[in-house]
Amino acid sequence: MFTFLKLIAGFRVTFSAMFKKPVTEGYPEKPGPVAPRYHGRHQLNRWPDGLEKCIGCELCAWACPADAIFVESADNTEAERFSPGERYGRVYQINYLRCIGCGFCIEACPTRALTMINDYEMADDNRADLIYGKDQLLAPLQPGMAAPPHPMAPGSTERDYYLLDNIAAANREAR
């Protein structure tokens, strides 16, 4: 009889839980909140006129302790200009199979071309898809930006880009 009462007491917890509203996450349909300072996926940023901030210096690759970043630089020409400097990152890859999310690459970047955004959905069933290329890492073009390659904003120099002196305004006036 005593064991039967213990059994009923145990089932009482089970039965009370059966009729409560389930506490589940509706994750695929409704993503959960992300902390404002959460660092997830990397992003290559652009200047206000659409040129890329990456100058192909490879400092991010040198700073990465996991050797997850590969950068191959090329020279800009006046006919094809991708960044305001003399070079740009022609090939830029981050291997998320190796990345440990330490942020050393962000600290090493002299032009703040590389940042980490709140995107955390990077899972995939194919290992090759976890090596993100430049096209996946570049920030999308905003209104008022032109897709590179294009010349620098009229009347501006490389120094103006790094000081952000009226680049967006000069670019809008040129159109």
Swiss-Prot record:
What intrachain disulfides are recorded? none
Q: Give the required cofactors.
A: [4Fe-4S] cluster
Binding, [4Fe-4S] cluster 2: 64, 99, 102, 105
Coiled-coil stretches: none
> In which residues is [4Fe-4S] cluster 1 bound?
54, 57, 60, 109
Provide the E.C. number(s) assigned to this enzyme. Answer: 7.1.1.-
Boundaries of each 4Fe-4S ferredoxin-type domain copy?
A: 44-74, 90-119
Q: Which InterPro entries match?
A: 4Fe4S_Fe-S-bd, 4Fe4S_Fe_S_CS, NADH_quinone_OxRdtase_chainI
Function in brief: NDH-1 shuttles electrons from NADH, via FMN and iron-sulfur (Fe-S) centers, to quinones in the respiratory chain. The immediate electron acceptor for the enzyme in this species is believed to be menaquinone. Couples the redox reaction to proton translocation (for every two electrons transferred, four hydrogen ions are translocated across the cytoplasmic membrane), and thus conserves the redox energy in a proton gradient.
The family annotation for this protein states:
Belongs to the complex I 23 kDa subunit family.
Under the subunit heading, UniProt states:
NDH-1 is composed of 14 different subunits. Subunits NuoA, H, J, K, L, M, N constitute the membrane sector of the complex.
What name is this protein filed under?
NADH-quinone oxidoreductase subunit I 1
- Kindly list the organism's lineage: Bacteria, Bacillati, Actinomycetota, Actinomycetes, Mycobacteriales
